[in-house]
Amino acid sequence: MITFKEKLNTLFDDYNKLITRKNVPLEDGNGIFTRYKYPILTAAHTPVFWRYDLDSESNPYLMERIGMNATLNSGAIKWNGKYLLVVRVEGADRKSFFAVAESPNGIDNFRFWDYPITMPEDVIPATNIYDMRLTAHEDGWVYGIFCAERHDPAAPAGDLSSATATAAIARTKDFVNWERLPDLKTGSQQRNVVLHPEFVNGKYALYTRPQDGFIDAGSGGGIGWALVDDMTHAEVREETIIDRRYYHTIKEVKNGEGPHPIKTPKGWLHLAHGVRGCAAGLRYVLYMYMTSLEDPTRVIASPAGAIMVPEGGERVGDVSNVLFSNGWIADEDGKVFIYYASSDTRMHVATSTIDRLVDYCLNTPQDGYSSSASVETLKRQIAKNLKLMS
């Protein structure tokens, strides 16, 4: 019979093999980005000493005491030379919390810090918190904006599913100690808010996503833009929709900003998610657009369709057919690390460059919003290529 110590050694050996496994780029890409063979974080990547009581007296059978279900939707930042993710970790009890995982190279060897983040509560405590967007703002703080979920107080008796969503705000300078600021005041529910990294006209700028309910965007028109005077008492008084939803597109049901945009010489690069309905439920994909440096509310490029969709094993998980990203890192040499979750279950990385992503945005045809328009766009490319091939 295997002893407690032998089983414990096996647990740690298997864990160390997992977190030190070298990731491998997949070379069958589309020229825009490169996927990698292995997920960078799964529930199994959470430390053994989080999940198991290692005391042979209190846990003689070495049972898992605190189960972890998923690692997903992670904010990202380059910090002191390391690639940091503020990971949404979901426990077996369905509660999410934040934990920092760091890597020396951004593609593998991600290791969780010993303790998860202790996030201070708002005046009204939240039941669940998740999906943090990180922004190193020019005011000197790193802000994390995330969704705070609470049971809807207006729900009928017995309705234990209705919820409300607010944009919670916290800031830090070391990722250990966080200052919780009041939730964003808005005229609608908000679960998808991102802070622009620079002041605009002396104010803080937010990308928003107004919606009528906890899930449904309803009358919310798309990705919004708002200016606020003070992040310590942030209030949206006026919103402008800068990236609209459209019928029969990848973003007809709803869309939302992912991480904060990347500044390039030709404009701001944006990564977002789009949602449409299908027979299998809601399908989440990733898409890009660009806005002007002089006027960040003006869209200057909007490629048709998705840049990234679920493939292979990415399509299966707790919420299948979903890709979601709220974190990317642009290195000094122009390399871009795109961190995305698949099917609300695991984290992946894809790499590209600023030059490639700008080229993709500026030179990919826009959506014509009809089958006939799509055919005409395709015919133009076919004619050009046939001429080159002749």
Region spans (language model):
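Beta-rich carbohydrate-recognition and catalytic domains
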Residues: 1-73, 77-127, 136-194, 198-253, ...
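Active-site/ligand-binding surface loops and adjacent short beta/alpha elements
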Residues: 260
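Well-ordered alpha/beta subsegment
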Residues: 312, 329-334
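Extended, compositionally biased non-globular segments
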Residues: 323-327
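Short, surface-exposed ligand- or partner-binding patches at beta-edge/loop junctions that are enriched
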Residues: 337
